Amino acid sequence: MGQHDWYRNKEWSEDIELAFRARLSRSRDLYNKTQYLRIQASYLLSSSDPTIQNVGLGMMNEVLSDYPDIDDVIFNKFDALVNVGDFFYRREDFETAYINYKKAIGYDKKKTVVQDHAYHGFIKSAVFSKHEEAYPAGLKYLEDARDTNLLFLSEIYDHYLASAMLYAAIGRHETAKECASVSLRVLNEESPLHMKSGLRSIDRKR
């Protein structure tokens, strides 16, 4: 076992838990402690076994409930909420996903944590669960972020997929089609430079 593998277990048992808890108890730094706990939980949430998934959810709840909202912990709480949001989004429980993404964005506003993925998940789950009150904030974020935060193809894809969904939900169907077209182009693996040029030409049409 590598030195970092003790908090990256993909299987779970009583013996594994005892070993994990023993190592975790040796960590005195709250940032590291909550990070180890969150990372281990994220591995368990990726399991196909519902029992192991529930253990992962319990660990995420530990991060969120058992530690204070201080600078050393806030980033791991933010990531925990995003991880839980992603888990429920994959299960198509969009209401629960929305609740967790919304809480994550609340941390973002408090501590200027920047993670586009949380906003994209928030917007997509808001559309699926019909939280229309979230649409104005989602639209503002998407339009403000377009030319500043998009660096990688995965970010561009997620951004324009969320944009397409939100524009369709508010009745701006032509813009939704343009955004959907961009997300499809990303799936064809066009280069980031080419993509960014194309995105700005779309922006000018709005």
Where are these regions (language model features)?
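Hydrophobic, well-structured mid-protein blocks that either form specific transmembrane helices
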Residues: 88-135
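N-terminal alpha-helical interaction modules that lie
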Residues: 1-79, 83-91, 173, 177-206
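Alpha-helical linker/edge segments of TPR/alpha-solenoid repeat scaffolds
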Residues: 11-14, 123-137, 164-175, 202-206
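TPR/TPR-like (Sel1-like) alpha-helical repeat modules
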Residues: 98-106, 133-145, 168-191
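Residue signature of alpha-solenoid helical repeat architecture, marking inter-repeat boundaries
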Residues: 31-32, 75, 113-117, 151-155
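Residue at a conserved register position within TPR or TPR-like alpha-solenoid repeats
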Residues: 44-45, 81, 88, 126-129, ...
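The tetratricopeptide repeat
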Residues: 36, 73, 80, 118-121, ...
